[in-house]
Swiss-Prot record:
Source lineage: Bacteria, Pseudomonadati, Pseudomonadota, Gammaproteobacteria, Thiotrichales
Job description of the protein: Binds 23S rRNA and is also seen to make contacts with the A and possibly P site tRNAs.
Recorded superkingdom: Bacteria
Subunit structure of this chain's protein: Part of the 50S ribosomal subunit.
Family, similarity comment: Belongs to the universal ribosomal protein uL16 family.
Pfam family, one: Ribosomal_L16
UniProt protein name: Large ribosomal subunit protein uL16
Signal peptide region: none
InterPro entries: Ribosomal_uL16, Ribosomal_uL16_bact-type, Ribosomal_uL16_CS, Ribosomal_uL16_dom, Ribosomal_uL16_sf
Molecular-function GO term, any one: rRNA binding
Annotated gene: rplP
Length: 137
């Protein structure tokens, strides 16, 4: 699963997830992309589940790019522990997603196959998504 090799600090504050994605909002590497239309947090497990769904559907053809990375640690206290005594330990990692962010990209497959593969990946995502194509100038 995806997570940073090392970080400056083990734990982070919650912070807000506002605004639109001004970076990473265009299809850069592939021909087709899966773009988020709502905001949320995607865990490393969900990113991997989406990647597997896409790669199983396209079989051997095509190339996949994952355009997001889970770099935010989420902490949790154990069950039945009283409040206080410090912040809990890191349980999992998430990527914060703003509307407009491209999650996955694909190339080397037909558009219909790409649409079906992204539909399967979208079913595993906690955010609403849409299919986008590369803009040719």
């Amino acid at each position: 699963m995806l997570q940073p090799k090392r970080t400056k600090f083990r734990k982070q504050q919650k912070l807000r997830n506002r605004g639109l994605a001004y970076r990473g909002n265009k299809v850069s590497f592939g021909e087709f992309g899966l773009q988020a239309t709502s905001r949320g947090r995607i865990t490393a497990r969900q990113i991997e589940a989406g990647r597997r769904a896409i790669s199983r559907h396209i079989k051997r053809g095509g190339k996949i790019w994952i355009r997001i990375f889970p770099d935010k640690p989420i902490t949790q206290k154990p069950l039945e522990v009283r409040m206080g005594k410090g912040k809990g330990s890191v349980e999992y990692w998430v990527a914060q997603i703003q509307p407009g962010r491209v999650l996955y990209e694909i190339t080397g497959v037909k558009e219909e196959l790409a649409r079906e593969a992204f539909a399967r990946a979208a079913a595993k995502m906690p955010v609403q998504t849409t299919f986008v194509e590369k803009q040719v100038m």
